[in-house]
Amino acid sequence: MQVNIAAALVERLLSEAAVDPTREVCGLLYGNEGRIEAAEWTPNVADDPDRTFEIEPAALFMAIRLERQGGPRLIGHYHSHPNGSAEPSPRDLAAAEPGKLWLIIGGGQARLWYVEAGAFREAQMIIN
């Protein structure tokens, strides 16, 4: 799977994660199957935001509602691993929704993943 994303958007997400490098940042990804068009930061409402993330339910429900009304297509989520790599954790896999992209930021890089047959597979992120 190949997915295009603007270099400026990748830089913005890396910068966002660097603002508070001890906590996981998270948000929503919008676009289509071949391109991430936009990302929206959402509050991390997890009980332990230093180790995990939970997208604010109201923000997620609003994104789904807007998509159903003809708004931007919600294609996935992003989050950071403050003390780890940009690879999915077992916790990520347990929460993963098939058909959605997972952009993970860690170790100064961003990598893109999707679930297939119960496992994460890395997507080729084409930065342009």
Predicted segments with their positions:
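Conserved beta-strand-loop surface patch within small alpha/beta domains used
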Residues: M1-L74, P82-N128
